[in-house]
C-alpha cells in the first residue's frame, strides 16, 4: 500500500507475513512432525500414528536419521514462525519533500536493534539506482545512494515479482519525486 501527495510519499512494506512464508512454515512443521513420529515409533517398536507405519523401520540407522531430520525441521519451522510472528522486514519508506527528510523504518529481530530507523536529508541523496541481474534467478533491486552513507536497498531482494517495466516505472517516479538522477548497474 502506498500513499502519495504533492509533498509526501509513504510506501508501506509487507515484511515476512507473506502467503508463501505461511505455506512453507506449515509444510515444514507438518513434515518434521511426521519424520519425528516415525523415528520415535521405530525406537518404541509400535506405531504412534496409524497413518505412518514404522514397524519395518529399524531404529539404527533409519530411525535415528528420521528423528534427526524431524528435530532439525522443527527448529527451522520455529525460526520461520518467529519471523512471521515478529513480522521481520516490514516497515515503511517516507519521503517528505516539504521538510526535506527521508525516513526509512524496518522491524528486525527482537533485541537492542529491533527497530531500524534511518533518517536522511533529501539533499544528501545522490541518485536512485537499479540493479538488474537476468538469468535463471533474475533480480531487480531499487537502491538509493546517499552521500557519505553508501547505497540503501528500497526493495527486498526476494521480490521477484517486479517486471523490468515495473521497476523502471517505480524508479522513474521516485527519481522524479526526489529530483535526482537514475543509474542502472
UniProtKB/Swiss-Prot annotation:
Location of this chain's protein in the cell: Plastid, Chloroplast thylakoid membrane
TM helices/strands, residue ranges: 21-43, 63-85
GO biological process assignments: photosynthesis
Membrane topology: Multi-pass membrane protein
A single cellular component GO annotation: photosystem I
InterPro entries, per database record: PSI_Ycf4_assembly (IPR003359)
Iron as UniProt keyword: no
Keyword field: Chloroplast, Membrane, Photosynthesis, Plastid, Thylakoid, Transmembrane, Transmembrane helix
Annotated family: Belongs to the Ycf4 family.
Summary of the function given for this chain in its UniProt record: Seems to be required for the assembly of the photosystem I complex.
PANTHER family linked: PHOTOSYSTEM I ASSEMBLY PROTEIN YCF4 (PTHR33288:SF4), PTHR33288
Protein name in the entry: Photosystem I assembly protein Ycf4
Species this protein is from: Triticum aestivum
Amino acid at each position: 500500500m502506498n500513499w502519495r501527495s504533492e509533498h509526501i510519499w509513504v510506501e508501506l512494506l509487507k515484511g515476512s507475513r507473506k502467503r508463501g512464508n505461511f505455506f512453507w512454515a506449515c509444510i515444514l512443521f507438518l513434515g518434521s512432525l511426521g519424520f519425528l513420529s516415525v523415528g520415535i515409533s521405530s525406537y518404541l517398536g509400535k506405531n504412534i500414528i496409524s497413518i505412518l507405519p514404522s514397524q519395518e523401520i529399524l531404529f539404527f540407522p533409519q530411525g535415528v536419521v528420521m528423528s534427526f531430520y524431524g528435530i532439525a525441521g522443527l527448529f527451522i519451522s520455529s525460526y520461520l514462525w518467529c519471523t512471521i510472528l515478529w513480522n521481520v522486514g516490514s516497515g515503511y519508506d517516507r519521503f517528505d519533500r516539504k521538510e526535506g527528510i527521508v525516513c526509512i523504518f524496518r522491524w528486525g529481530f527482537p533485541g537492542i536493534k529491533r527497530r531500524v530507523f534511518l533518517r536522511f536529508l533529501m539533499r544528501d541523496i545522490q541518485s536512485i539506482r537499479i540493479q538488474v541481474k537476468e538469468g535463471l534467478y533474475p533480480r531487480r533491486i531499487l537502491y538509493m545512494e546517499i552521500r557519505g552513507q553508501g547505497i540503501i536497498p528500497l526493495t527486498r531482494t526476494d521480490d521477484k515479482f517486479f517486471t523490468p517495466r515495473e521497476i523502471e516505472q517505480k524508479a522513474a517516479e521516485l527519481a522524479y519525486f526526489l529530483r535526482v538522477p537514475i543509474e542502472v548497474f
